[in-house]
């Protein structure tokens, strides 16, 4: 009876039933932790995918804006090339105007019409470019506001709230896991201490049994049974030790898995931080690029405005030139009329000169005849000589020259005056002056 009571006390002290139930509960908790780790991994992958989808939308909008800006830059370069070509054409036309004297008015009018058409086209292009720049500015402001709203909504959107809740759950589960690890370590240490206590109790029981064996040699059979029971209990204790070792191995494996999961979480957090930093840097670079492009576009707009002002000034100058050309045309017409009148006057003067020449030749011939007559004194007497002298005085060439000197001829070009007696000098002067 005493042996049976000692056996029951040993069994109660060992607590085999509680150990088996605790091992099952530990396995169930380990499986739950595995499932929770898998769910956390899936949630993190979903977070990554959602973050990538969120980052792609503004990037596509910004890429479209960049393509539009490049297209505008190509148009600007084409317009600059066209302007250079037109300026070259204007220079060639000016040279042609300088070279050609008879076709000045028609060529200038055609050039003015072309320039007016070109100025209208440039104004239309400038207005279109201004509208496009304003549209781009509005789009850029909308994109920047959208990026700001997306950055602000990152903390308030439903998906991010779910992800944050999942992260909080993961952190809480990690804390529970740490508490469970600590509890398991305390449990294992308690089991080991209990095993040590049981071994001490077994030693004490062995010593007590030996003492009882010495005291009661008659109860050999009961002692053998007790020894068998003790051996069975020792086997059970060894089994328990094996189970504890298995639990320790499993605990180490679970702790390794938990450490790996922690490392993965840390790496994912680092990656998310790096992605956020890279996205912020990209946004900053894009904003800087957009600002630079806006500054360039503003400079281009200013240059176009200056060019338009220059064009307007050129138009004013061309209008002044048109007026001057019209005045020159009128003056040329007036000069033509003056030339025609002068030519008519010259024809009249030449006719008069011819008449005067004829008269002079006649007078010279008559003078020669008279001189020849005066050379024969025998045929004339004194009275005849007096008559002839009187007639000579009346019709002398000096008098004729004096009559001719009273009428004056003028050069139509420079206004130089010559008497009619110097008609030959006037003709030489006209040849020199008009050449």
UniProtKB/Swiss-Prot annotation:
Region (Disordered): 1-63, 213-239, 268-287
Sorted UniProt keywords: Coiled coil, Cytoplasm, Cytoskeleton, Developmental protein
Coiled coil: 18-140, 185-373
Cellular component aspect of the GO annotation: centriole; centrosome; cleavage furrow; cytoplasm; Flemming body; midbody
Gene name for this UniProt entry: cep55
UniProt KW tRNA processing keyword: no
Basic and acidic residues: bias regions: 26-49, 213-222
Subcellular location, record wording: Cytoplasm; Cytoplasm, Cytoskeleton, Microtubule organizing center, Centrosome, Centriole; Cytoplasm, Cytoskeleton, Microtubule organizing center, Centrosome; Cleavage furrow
Protein name stated in the entry: Centrosomal protein of 55 kDa
Function: Plays a role in mitotic exit and cytokinesis. Recruits PDCD6IP and TSG101 to midbody during cytokinesis. Required for successful completion of cytokinesis. Not required for microtubule nucleation. Plays a role in the development of the brain and kidney.
Tagged with keyword Cytoplasm: yes
Domain of life: Eukaryota
Gene null: resulting phenotype: Morpholino knockdown of the protein increases jaw cartilage disorganization, decreases the size of brain structures and the lateral area and convolution of proximal renal tubules at 4 days post-fertilization (dpf). Embryos with CRISPR-induced cep55l null mutations display altered craniofacial patterning and atrophy of the proximal renal tubules.
Pfam family, one: EABR
GO biological process: cerebellum development; cranial skeletal system development; establishment of protein localization; mitotic cytokinesis; regulation of phosphatidylinositol 3-kinase/protein kinase B signal transduction
């Amino acid at each position: 009876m005493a042996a049976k009571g000692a056996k029951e006390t040993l069994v109660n002290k060992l607590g085999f039933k509680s150990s088996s139930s605790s091992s099952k509960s530990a396995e169930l908790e380990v499986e739950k932790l595995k499932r929770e780790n898998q769910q956390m991994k899936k949630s993190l992958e979903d977070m990554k995918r959602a973050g990538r989808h969120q980052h792609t939308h503004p990037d596509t909008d910004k890429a479209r804006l960049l393509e539009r800006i490049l297209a505008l830059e190509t148009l600007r370069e084409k317009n600059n090339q066209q302007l250079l070509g037109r300026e070259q054409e204007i220079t060639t036309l000016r040279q042609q105007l300088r070279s050609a004297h008879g076709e000045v008015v028609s060529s200038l009018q055609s050039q003015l019409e072309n320039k007016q058409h070109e100025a209208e086209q440039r104004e239309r292009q400038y207005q279109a470019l201004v509208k496009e720049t304003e549209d781009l500015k509005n789009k850029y402001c909308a994109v920047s506001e959208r990026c700001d709203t997306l950055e602000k909504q990152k903390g308030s959107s439903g998906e991010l709230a779910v992800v944050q809740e999942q992260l909080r759950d993961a952190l809480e589960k990690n804390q529970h896991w740490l508490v469970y690890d600590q509890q398991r370590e305390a449990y294992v240490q308690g089991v080991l201490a209990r095993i040590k206590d049981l071994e001490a109790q077994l030693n004490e029981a062995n010593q007590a049994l030996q003492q009882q064996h010495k005291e009661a040699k008659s109860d050999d059979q009961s002692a053998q049974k007790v020894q068998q029971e003790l051996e069975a209990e020792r086997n059970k204790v060894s089994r328990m030790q094996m189970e504890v070792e298995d639990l320790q191995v499993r605990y180490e494996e679970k702790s390794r898995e938990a450490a790996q999961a922690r490392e993965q979480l840390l790496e994912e957090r680092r990656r998310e931080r790096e992605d956020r930093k890279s996205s912020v840097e990209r946004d900053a670079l894009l904003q800087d690029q957009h600002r630079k492009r806006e500054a360039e576009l503003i400079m281009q707009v200013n240059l176009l405005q200056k060019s338009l002002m220059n064009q307007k000034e050129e138009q004013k100058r061309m209008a002044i030139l048109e007026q001057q050309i019209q005045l020159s045309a009128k003056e040329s017409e007036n000069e033509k009329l003056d030339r025609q009148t002068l030519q008519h006057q010259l024809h009249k003067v030449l006719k008069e000169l011819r008449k005067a020449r004829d008269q002079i030749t006649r007078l010279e011939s008559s003078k020669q005849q008279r001189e020849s007559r005066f050379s024969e004194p025998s045929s004339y007497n004194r009275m005849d000589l007096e008559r002839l002298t009187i007639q000579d005085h009346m019709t002398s060439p000096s008098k004729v020259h004096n009559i001719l000197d009273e009428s004056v001829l003028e050069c139509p070009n420079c206004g130089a005056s010559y008497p009619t007696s110097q008609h030959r000098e006037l003709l030489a002067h006209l040849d020199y002056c008009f050449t």
